[in-house]
Design a protein with these regions (language model features):
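Short helix-coil junctions and helix-kink-helix linkers
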Residues: 76-87, 190-201
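Short, Lys/Arg-rich nucleic-acid/phosphate-binding segment
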Residues: 107-113, 221-230
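Short amphipathic alpha-helical interaction segments
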Residues: 85-96, 199-210
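Short recognition helix of helix-turn-helix/winged-helix DNA-binding domains
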Residues: 1-78, 95-102, 111-112, 116-191
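Short, charged/polar, Gly/Pro-enriched secondary-structure boundary elements
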Residues: 119-126, 235-243
Length: 250
């Protein structure tokens, strides 16, 4: 039986493997790691509790990786590597969480240490988040980390990445041999997207515009009542992802 990775490795550029020892080169390791990263499960209730989509995303990543009450060393580089958020976004999210009392910050020999206050987070969730059975049981939005980091790398906001993730989640699976340059059109009503992501209608319009400007998303309104439909360009997303991954090997 072939190893599970044999087919994946065969699809990578030959120059990536050099003399046959790809794992000895840190650039190659970064390239492979970008391919195999697990998706992020976005918890919309975190965004509702904090009144911030980006802070909700950061908490989704944080809780997936660290335990409550665990002291964690965080800085710009660590946050960028683990979440894709740049310096400005990280500091804004950090201030939001510190002001809400969810994160505690201490410095230990010049290193910033952070700890999550689980009780405070639970209190905010009970006050501000939709904890109904329907909301809790609804399928969460899953973000492809490679696509997320690709779009952030090319200057888009996390909100644009989140909107694309909703389109991808609603797109029916298509066999690789049958895929076209664009995905099929799928309905994307604004209110439904708000319920699943906490993105306002204005934020959705801006995110869609940013995705259209970079050539990733197309939208149209059909039917009666008129409903927004969207599709994304697999070809353009692949080009942007390749550009981002090439930057990891420079």
């Amino acid at each position: 039986m072939k190893p599970a990775t044999s087919e994946l490795v065969a699809t990578l550029p030959p120059e990536l493997f050099g003399s046959g020892y790809p794992y000895l080169d840190i650039r190659n390791t970064a390239y492979l790691a970008a391919l195999w990263e697990e998706p992020v499960t976005y918890v919309v209730q975190f965004a509702q509790a904090l009144d911030s989509v980006t802070a909700g995303y950061f908490l989704s990543c944080y809780i997936e990786r660290y335990r409550p009450d665990e002291w964690v060393s965080l800085n710009e580089d660590i946050v960028r590597h683990e979440t894709g958020l740049g310096r400005g976004r990280w500091y804004k999210v950090r201030d939001t969480l510190l002001n809400a009392g969810i994160l505690t910050n201490e410095r230990d020999i010049g290193v910033s240490m952070y700890r999550l206050n689980g009780d405070k987070l639970e209190s905010l969730l009970r006050q501000h988040a939709d904890l109904s059975l329907c909301a809790i049981a609804a399928a969460p939005v899953s973000l492809n980390r490679l696509h997320l980091k690709t779009l952030l790398h090319h200057g888009l906001s996390f909100k644009a990445c989140l909107l694309l993730a909703v389109v991808q989640a609603d797109t029916p699976h298509t066999a690789l041999a049958d895929r076209q340059a664009y995905s099929p059109w799928v309905p994307l009503p604004e209110q439904v997207v708000t319920e699943r992501t906490f993105l306002s209608r204005t934020e959705q319009r801006r995110a869609a515009e940013d995705l259209r400007n970079i050539g990733v998303l197309e939208t149209k309104y059909d039917g009666f009542p008129r409903i927004r439909h969207s599709r994304y360009s697999l070809q353009r997303l692949a080009e942007l992802s390749d550009s981002y991954m090439q930057s990891l090997t420079v």
